[in-house]
């Protein structure tokens, strides 16, 4: 974000802090201006100021921000404010006053993603965004779709429904975690391509192990063969910085209630402008909207308060800075993983290459059932992680902190797990 906008727009971001926190936050950001992101990642005074923006329950250690993240107070207050405005007379205020502001949200999302606003549809989550494309593509019996066995289950289910309904063929490739290289991932995906392949569906970063995929490399290889690529960016957008042109894809769907910290139930779909007409909307739209990105938003009455609060979340994100966030996420992941990685039976299934990983960490302990480990951490210590099993390949727990996570919380998690490993078992 431009410095001028930050200094001007950061005040709304921090308006929900304690009375003097606005000035503290502004001073903190001014003090780190010009410093490298890796240095700021370890600056606990800076991140303390950021933590003041949240009203999270510190009686739990939430390391499942990959599922859904809490919004800063400025976002929840904006949502409440828009609800109150709407309640004064929804037929007027929701439709005539708040409704048109969706165009500001569209413009801000497009600016952050690096595309034309006329290529952004605001959705309720990544699943809806992606299913618009999956169900709206013109495919016939025998057409092949290539994805991986580690893509998001809901998206795989969507393609399986098209198998049952339309007779398409879904092919799922496996891959090593962590992979030896990005080229390896491209080779694995492209190895399943045949003359009948019409679509490749990949995660920008997987929800399971946090493996980042070489999207542009796969898109270029696919486009040379006339194959469309659908990119699931549910965990990528705002976890680490990138733009549309870094990907070169035609279709991209993401959630905004994870790393953007927007209200729960927000997301967006990007469709390259010349491809909008090729995709049927999930809900009916008139022929006059065939080439209009807004046809994908024709879902009936829905609350303006959620989508309009996205702009506050984007301002908060921009105020911190994408590079700073990514550096902090990597720092937190390495802090716990470096402490545990050399213990008996431990595998950290994340590449140390920053091009391949960011904030999502994956811990596997030989002999430890992931479900029992996650349950013990929650029941005994109120630490929240996600158990994940990829049958026949790997299993463990996913660990996802966020900008409000403290070093004490990370160290508590690592200390508890270390004691369990040295004990050799999970208490019954």
Task: Identify the function of each model-found stretch.
Residues 5-428:
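Pyridoxal 5′-phosphate
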């Amino acid at each position: 974000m431009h410095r001028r906008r930050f200094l001007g727009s950061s005040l709304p971001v921090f308006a929900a802090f304690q009375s003097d926190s606005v000035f503290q936050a502004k001073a903190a950001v001014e003090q780190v201006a010009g410093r490298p992101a890796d240095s700021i990642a370890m600056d606990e005074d800076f991140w303390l100021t950021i933590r003041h923006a949240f009203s999270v329950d510190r009686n739990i250690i939430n390391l499942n921000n990959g599922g859904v993240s809490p919004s800063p107070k400025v976002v929840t207050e904006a949502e409440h404010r828009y609800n109150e405005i709407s309640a004064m007379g929804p037929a007027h205020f929701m439709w005539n006053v708040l409704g048109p502001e969706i165009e500001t949200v569209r413009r801000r999302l497009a600016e952050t993603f690096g595309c034309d606003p006329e290529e952004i549809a605001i959705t309720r989550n990544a699943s809806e965004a992606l299913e618009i494309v999956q169900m709206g593509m013109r495919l016939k019996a025998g057409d092949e779709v290539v994805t991986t066995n580690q893509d998001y289950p809901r998206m795989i289910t969507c393609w399986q429904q098209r198998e049952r309904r339309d007779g398409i063929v879904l092919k799922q490739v496996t891959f090593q975690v962590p992979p030896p290289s990005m080229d390896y991932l491209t080779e694995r995906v492209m190895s399943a391509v045949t003359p009948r392949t019409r679509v490749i569906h990949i995660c920008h970063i997987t929800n399971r192990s946090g493996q980042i995929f070489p999207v542009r490399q796969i898109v270029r290889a696919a486009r040379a063969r006339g194959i469309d690529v659908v990119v699931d960016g549910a965990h990528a957008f705002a976890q680490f910085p990138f733009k549309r042109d870094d990907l070169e894809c035609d279709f991209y769907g993401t959630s905004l209630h994870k790393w953007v910290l927007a209200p729960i139930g927000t997301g967006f779909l990007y469709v390259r402008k010349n491809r909008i007409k090729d995709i049927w909307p999930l809900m009916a739209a008139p022929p006059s909207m065939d080439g209009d990105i807004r046809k994908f938003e024709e879902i009936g009455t829905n609350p303006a308060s959620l989508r309009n609060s996205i702009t506050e979340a984007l301002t908060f994100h921009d105020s911190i800075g994408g590079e700073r966030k990514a550096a902090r996420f990597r720092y937190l992941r390495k802090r716990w993983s470096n402490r545990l990685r050399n213990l008996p039976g431990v595998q950290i299934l994340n590449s140390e290459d920053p091009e391949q990983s960011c904030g999502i960490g994956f811990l596997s302990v030989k002999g430890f059932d992931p479900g029992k480990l996650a349950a013990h951490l929650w029941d005994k210590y109120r630490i929240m992680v996600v158990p994940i099993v990829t049958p026949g390949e790997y299993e463990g727990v996913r660990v996802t902190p966020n900008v409000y996570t403290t070093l004490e919380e990370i160290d508590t998690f690592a200390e508890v797990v270390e004691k369990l490993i040295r004990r050799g078992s999970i208490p019954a």
